[in-house]
Amino acid sequence: MIKEFKEFIMRGNVLDMAVGVILGAALKSIVDSLTKNLINPIISLFVGQVDLSGIAVTIPGTKAVFQIGNFLNDVINFLIIAIIVFLIVKGFNKLRDMGKKTEEEVAEEAAPTQEELYLKEIRDLLANKDHQ
């Protein structure tokens, strides 16, 4: 059972996922800081509050409070992370595609052109003529 678990853990997909989770956690803290220290002050120019988490709406006659500011912070964080992940995936896909040859390129390399066939035929005829 331990051997099976070790094989499972050592597979590339599990290790890739573990690295992704760790990097994702690190990225989240960076994005939180970006939102808090750079984006919120810019938004405060329009809203009037530096800390968006303070924006809330209380329903009259109740104690229910809609924490709109916290929600806006989370939406901003999500959008930033989504854009970063999209750009990373797009970059990796582009690198992967650069390494692959298209089917047409492979077919072109495999099949000799008509000119190459004629040249080989001429070469073979000349070689046979010299040996006779």
UniProtKB/Swiss-Prot annotation:
It is found in: Cell membrane. Pfam families: MscL (PF01741). The chain crosses the membrane at residues 14-34, 39-59, 68-88. Keywords: Cell membrane, Ion channel, Ion transport, Membrane, Transmembrane, Transmembrane helix, Transport. It comes from the Bacteria. One of its GO terms (cellular component) is plasma membrane. GO terms for molecular function: mechanosensitive monoatomic ion channel activity. It is a multi-pass membrane protein. NCBIfam families: mscL. Channel that opens in response to stretch forces in the membrane lipid bilayer. May participate in the regulation of osmotic pressure changes within the cell. Belongs to the MscL family. Homopentamer. This is Large-conductance mechanosensitive channel. The gene is mscL.
